[in-house]
Amino acid sequence: KMLLIVDRGVVKNSSYYNKIKMLLKKYKDSLIEIQLRDDEEPSYDYLDEVAGKVRKIPNLDVIIGIGGGSSIDMAKAICALYTNPGLSIKYRGFDNLVSPGIPSICIPTTAGTGSEVTVNAVFTDKSQMKKLGINGRYMSATYAILDAKWLQSCPKSASISSGMDALVH
């Protein structure tokens, strides 16, 4: 079974999303899709909400994440949480994950965060109002697909923000 995690902005604004859906059409019986809400930065609470739903899917083989840095972080973290029980916040910090997650394929639609190739995923801890990460060897994507055509659907403001993000790293 495959899980496609995609942010709503990609669904609304990218013709490439439809191409991916067409490519995966032959797997429709084993494909599940979750569209992430895009009204705020992802929090540990939201991560736990989505991970709770995903953990109920038996025999999940791979997660495909499509979107900006936050969506890619969600996809990577959900891969890890599928095999590591409990609330996500207990894995905050470095190398607190016990088991490797299931395989992931990350397709970024912005250039700058590099989330698809890092061992970090950042979420907001609402109790502290801070962005803190789950970091470590089990947080990297299995595969990253980089295609400049995906960047064409990125809004100008997001391109500017992610470009600045790349410069400050």
List the predicted regions and their residue ranges.
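Alpha-helix N-cap/helix-start motif
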Residues: 13-14, 74-75, 115-116, 160
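Short Gly/Thr/Asp-enriched flexible loops that form oxyanion-binding sites at enzyme active sites
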Residues: 19-20, 49-51, 71-85, 117-118
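Alpha-helical hydrophobic/aromatic positions enriched in membrane-embedded helices and signal peptides
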Residues: 35, 59-61, 65, 100, ...
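Glycine/serine-rich anion-binding loops at beta->alpha junctions
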Residues: 59-78, 109-115
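A glycine/threonine-rich phosphate-anchoring loop and its flanking beta-alpha core
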Residues: 83-169
